[in-house]
């Protein structure tokens, strides 16, 4: 493949799933010999480090949270992106983010560069009238749309029309730190932000219904706005002595390696990175069918899928794995294969094949 100039547009380089994905993909693109230009739409402290060969630019202005200034910020961002696109003169553009996608599409209007966009949220997530309106009036102008799952692709066809160019490409996986000597504990582990959409309250409810297994603990990795509320829920259910809130941690892989079961109880997910990381650990995993799980889990083969909102079903699935070490081992062995499926070179090539399809 002839080397091309690729423009990558990201919300920022701050901590976030989009930023992590684009950092990984940008590094892979330059590894393949392409000239990569990375535009961050929001200036600020950088959580991720780009490959030194990636050209980077961010706006000289800082966004404000005031509602009265949001429209002005949008206009400034559109102008900034348009100016950078003209300067870079890319062969193709790739944008991630439900807020940034419409802005980038407007900025590219009249310039005619191929532009590929990707949402990173669940199709079930309501963004509000304004954002939904912006998506409806701009998305059809994209050269191509990247969907993380079949559920997301079907939704895009339904909303934007059956004639749009959609490709299903899952997220790539970060490098997992192997911990072969980790001591296993009777832990039911969950990883994620402590917020409503992550559904930790549902997991706590399900765990509280399990009796006769007092040696098992519920270990929650992550922090967020619902932490106090969840801690109160644990107290009311009288299971405080069996639940650990670990907060945000830098040793996630080591903690996963010590666990015995992983549960992702989310109400909605764009692409369940935490689930994939747990499978790669490897751990036997349980999730609701609300997170495009069927794209990742073959039910009863490499994980367990429970009907969304079925708390009793989730509790039963957890109990079944607690009582069956052989089943846990079998699911974990099969789950480990997710590493090969989401290997970054393989996923990186899928992105390149799509965003360079018109070359």
What are these regions (language model features)?
Residues 19-24, 186, 190-209, 214, ...:
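A conserved mid-protein helix/loop that constitutes part of the nucleotide-sugar donor-binding site
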Residues 248, 267:
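Aromatic "clamp/platform" in nucleotide-sugar-dependent glycosyltransferases that forms part
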Residues 284-287, 297:
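Short hydrophobic beta-strand element within catalytic cores of glycosyltransferases
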Residues 299-300, 304-311, 320-325:
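Conserved acidic donor-binding segment of nucleotide-sugar-dependent glycosyltransferases
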Residues 95-101, 119:
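Short His-centered aromatic/hydrophobic patch
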Residues 8-16, 20, 24, 28-72, ...:
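N-terminal strand-loop element at the rim of the active site
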Residues 242, 313, 320, 327-341, ...:
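A short, well-ordered alpha-helix in the C-terminal region of glycosyltransferases
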Residues 140-166, 173-175:
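A short, active-site helix/loop in glycosyltransferases that binds the activated sugar's phosphate group
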